[in-house]
Amino acid sequence: MKTLTTAACLLLCATACGQDIRSYVMANTVPVATLDATAAADDYADLAAVGQAIGEARVVMLGEQDHGDGPAFQAKTRLVKYLHERKGFTVLAFESDFYGLTTGWDQLAKQPDSIQYFLQRNIFSLWTRSADCRYLFEQYIPQSFQTANPLHLSGFDSQHYLGYSYLHLRTDLDRYLVSAGIANQFPSPAAYQQFLAAVQGRIAEMRTPGAFRPDMRKPLKDGLQLVSQAQLAAHDTSAWPLVIEGIRAFSLEERVPSEWARDKAMADNLKFLLTTRYKDAKIIVWAANQHIMKRTDQLPKGQKVDLILRNKMGTYFTRDPQWAKQTYVLGFASYQGTSGRLGGASYPVQAPDQHGLENWVPKGLAYGFLDFTAYNKQFNSPSAPFLLKSPSHYTIPARFAPIPWNLVYDGLFFIREMQATKKSE
């Protein structure tokens, strides 16, 4: 009887909290008037609630359910403009090549044509070739360098194989290892050259399948371990230990450990940008919902959800109280429509669960913003789960992972009608 009573109490508590969040969503989802970022004069009045929620945060993470969500790209572009023009953010960090996009950007002559050329080759084409991002890459960012308030670019992804890394990473790494006295710690000059060849093979594999041969695996693994140990012994605080860890993470063969290592590396790369490269700047993070999620270490474990929920960049990053206080994580949600990445087929997004958050948003809202931080303060950060299509375009059943999404994201940007992005002409 006692067990039944306890279970009943827990159920009642969860139900009450669920009713609280439903009422909160219905009453506090703020309409957003437009996704159009191209207006010459924009007073951003409809984004005032976003600005108020963000407050003095130094990091704002902008998610997306899939890398083929056209309206989400448009919304993020307008949010980038708003954060840059009204909230003092001066760096846009993409889920793209940490070494190539960051180092290459430093070397770049900041002229409109050269900026466009560089971005097309050092940010994933999922975005740079999208018609929904065209204004951002071809106009807004390049033109910002004709003003007194330029928007700088950086990357934080540990996948180092885009244009600049493909052309320069091996040579730059060789120069670094020689100058740091690490090259001569290899067993022989031949072993060192085998390591460099394996690094280049791994970088080239994505564009030239077969470039990373099976016989390169051991030289790469052994070399990365040697370099990492030497860096640790030397207390190296440069970006190179992060690059080495990124290559290691990218070289792991099993998908789940590789993705976990990737997210950990992305969090470390972002911290480096904030503490070293752009130590006085506010940074906008452009990534997938799946990477920016917080508190995923507190969610249930299980083989069915480990890849999509466990050990995420946002979780690693906000474990540090310093960054937890200075970060606002904005997830994206949608009701219906299609999605589809460039180069792939479009697909219909899953309908929301009848009891899901999407059905609590007032039906007349095409776009809306919902701030969870006010709800969490009002109800002492309730951890009762509720349903939401997230981090992707489907609802994770509660039997697999009951999730309090109000603790995973600080807020949500809602789009009623999603559309698959199209290639820029």
Annotate each language-model stretch with its function.
Residues 1-23:
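Bacterial Sec-dependent N-terminal signal peptides
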